Regions:
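Short, structured surface patches at the beginning of a domain
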Residues: 1-135
Length: 135
């Protein structure tokens, strides 16, 4: 059973931006036949990594309440590359698959940026999936 969390964050207090992210990710979840069990909506700066929503996401991962996380962009985690990498490593440690809604193609672990980041992590099995519903 695939238990999926949708994580949406914006720095501005725009409900429209959060609604757009959630709607897009619900569509992606449907397209991928994923069971969305949690939707986390957060309005906070990407520079702050002590956010209630991000903390909730990590708690769900640690407690093995989710298997997959969907987000529209990797920068929804945050704006500090090293801290983002630490979050990715923590998700990987708990066996969580991260699916990022991206461009026009579906790329599974072939992203040059992720290959570069993997050189700095002790977890060579780190997998981030970049996906799109565009065919």
């Amino acid at each position: 059973m695939n238990r999926t969390a949708i994580y949406a964050r914006t720095a501005s207090p725009s409900e429209t931006a959060l609604d757009w992210q959630v709607q897009a990710l619900q569509g992606l979840a449907s397209y991928l036949s994923l069971n969305v069990t949690h939707i986390i909506r957060e309005t906070a700066s990407g520079l702050d990594f002590e956010r209630p929503g991000l903390n909730k996401l990590m708690c769900l991962a640690k407690q093995h309440e989710i298997d997959t996380v969907l987000m529209t962009n990797l920068n929804r985690i945050g704006r500090d590359a090293l801290k983002v990498l630490a979050v990715l490593e923590e998700l990987e440690k708990h066996g969580i698959k991260l699916i990022i809604q991206g461009g026009d193609t579906v790329e599974v672990a072939d992203n040059p940026l992720l290959k570069y980041l993997r050189r700095f992590t002790p977890h060579p099995s780190l997998e981030v999936v970049l996906a799109s519903t565009t065919e």
